[in-house]
Amino acid sequence: MLALAIVAALFAAQAAVPPAPTRWVEDGVGLLSPATRSALDARLEGYQHATGHQVVVWIGDTLDGAPLDEWAVRTFAAWKVGRQGLDDGVAMFILVGDRAIDLEVGYGLEGQVTDAAAAQIIALMAPRLRAGDRDGAVTTGVEAVLATIEGRPWTGGSTPTDAPAGGPTTLQWILGILAALGFLVLAITHPRFAMMLLWTVATAGRGRGGFAGGGGRSGGGGARGRW
């Protein structure tokens, strides 16, 4: 009976994993202004399309005393953050009621976003949160994560001057034009095959939110802290 009671207590202490997000920035408590939330969401969506790396931000209230690190690992795995086989994802969890931040890093990015680097990013965010600069804190954290992944110098500002815009590069434009021309030739020479290809591409992502990943292995890499 004692063993059953201990097991029951352990399960009761576990905070539930939230539903997988459908966007790159989920703010369930209104920490961010709508403009900042939209801007960061677009920034991270563009970054994923440009690099393949998946960085997400989830903002909630409290875990009611449950261990943050254990919950973050379970949530990261359940959401499958990052690409399958690469696990190149980072999740920033912010618990406003607990005044806590967790940066969970997938195995594929642990070489770039080390535990020490993750701790430094949280240290950049904490004083801004204490001062009430919520938008600036999260924007700073996001830009610091991206700069760290790319190995760019980081001075701690909220908008690095050398940060990429996240939109298509010249090479991507050229490849897109070549792909369009190739499809046009295929449509003329083999119209049925072209239509099948178009249908396959159009339906490949149905049933998934824009966020959907395939990774999720982290092993607890990253850091956590409070403000």
PLM feature segments, named:
Residues 1, 92, 125, 195-196:
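Detector for methionine-enriched segments
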Residues 11-14, 144-227:
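Low-complexity, glycine/proline/serine-enriched intrinsically disordered segments
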Residues 1-10:
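Bacterial N-terminal signal peptides
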Residues 13-173:
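Folded, non-transmembrane soluble domains that reside on the lumenal/extracytoplasmic side of membranes
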